[in-house]
């Protein structure tokens, strides 16, 4: 999930070119054979650039999973080795990052990138080389399915955008008890537009109504004109699907004009920067969908939190958890595929994952390579995240 979900044709051309170069560089050695004494896992993440926080967090979770697997004896008698590659938060660089991991480091699979745009750009490369890729937190539906066709080598470890859009409409209807809702979305983000569309459709199905719908653009800083129009429509709540950079400013300005209705959003809100920019008081009576909360008392969640804190001396966030889950999925699939399995056999093993114990509970893949999981609703109280409820649809 991220603002890089805008998958431009230029990015596709760059990625396709990279994939062709990867395929034309002479005979490609089988990646498993090249590292006979270990399994090398490629970690292509946003380690610098605009969304480096996402990439670094996700990578930390992956490393924890690998550390635990190795300490338990590894997989098929081999240790797992993570090779990092920085895609610089740029879709155009993502293809280069993954190409290097496949052609030079001979990885058996790729975990990452964190953002949908970078995953889209990496997809032609891994597909042409028949190397599975698990995207820990890329939520765009088209990541795993293109025009009804499931992508054989692409998987994810998070819920998809339509799911969290429906979840928040359910929350608005059942928990908040509101029917008249305004929407303020980012017209420059496929992520935001997609969430707004699904939320509105689901709300209408439940007998609700969108009384105002306004838009902004990424990097905007003044939202009061749109908010004034929304205020005039007298909404009972406002749905703001977007990223913390803009959302924090929107929340602050919403309160400044005296609009104190509940504000609800999505997993793009999840960042400490949200509190820094908006301020703790403005965030009261706000809620967003996520897949993780440190206050979730589920046994598997609390064990993951304790293990993560023991390794990193701080609490994990949603991205850490999703990276961790992706690592466990890959390790389990490597074991079931067997030593020496090629990319197609490994991909089939990933697709067959069923009831695998992970941080969030038990993970099973559906036919579209998406995990079947629940959503968490986070409530902000004086700048602190609070577990509100868990929703399964």
What are these regions (language model features)?
Residues 35, 39-63, 85-92, 114-115, ...:
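Extracytoplasmic "Venus flytrap"
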């Amino acid at each position: 999930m991220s603002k890089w979900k805008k998958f431009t044709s230029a990015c596709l051309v760059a990625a396709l070119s990279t994939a062709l170069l990867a395929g034309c560089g002479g005979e490609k050695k089988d990646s498993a054979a090249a590292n006979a004494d270990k399994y090398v896992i490629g970690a292509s993440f946003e380690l610098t650039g605009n969304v480096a926080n996402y990439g670094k967090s996700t990578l930390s979770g992956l490393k924890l999973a690998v550390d635990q697997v190795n300490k338990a004896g590894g997989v098929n008698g081999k240790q797992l080795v993570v090779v990092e590659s920085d895609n610089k938060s740029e879709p155009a660089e993502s293809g280069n990052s993954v190409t290097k991991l496949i052609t030079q480091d001979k990885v058996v699979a790729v975990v990452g990138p964190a953002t949908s745009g970078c995953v889209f750009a990496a997809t032609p490369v891994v597909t042409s080389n028949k190397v599975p890729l698990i995207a820990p937190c890329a939520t765009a539906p088209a990541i795993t399915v293109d025009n009804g066709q499931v992508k054989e080598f692409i998987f994810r470890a998070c819920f998809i955008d339509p799911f969290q859009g429906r979840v928040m409409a359910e929350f608005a209807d059942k928990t908040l008890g509101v029917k008249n809702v305004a929407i303020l979305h980012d017209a420059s983000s496929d992520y935001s537009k997609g969430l707004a569309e699904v939320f509105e459709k689901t709300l209408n199905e439940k007998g609700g109504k969108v009384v105002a719908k306004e838009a902004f653009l990424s990097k905007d800083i003044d939202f009061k004109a749109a908010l004034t129009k929304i205020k005039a429509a007298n909404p009972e709540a406002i749905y703001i699907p977007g990223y913390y950079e803009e959302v924090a400013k929107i929340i602050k300005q919403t309160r400044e004009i005296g609009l104190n209705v509940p504000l609800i959003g999505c997993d793009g809100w999840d960042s400490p920067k949200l509190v820094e920019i908006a301020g703790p008081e403005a965030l009261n009576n706000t809620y967003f969908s996520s897949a993780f909360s440190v206050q979730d008392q589920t046994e598997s969640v609390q064990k993951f939190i304790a293990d993560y804190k023991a390794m990193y001396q701080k609490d994990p966030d949603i991205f850490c958890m999703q990276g961790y889950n992706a690592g466990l999925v890959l390790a389990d699939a490597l074991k079931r595929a067997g030593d020496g399995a090629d990319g197609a056999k490994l991909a089939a093993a990933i697709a067959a994952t069923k009831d695998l114990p992970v941080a969030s509970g038990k993970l099973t893949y559906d036919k579209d390579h998406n995990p079947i999981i629940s959503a968490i609703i986070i409530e902000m109280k004086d700048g602190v995240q609070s577990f509100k409820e868990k929703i399964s649809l």
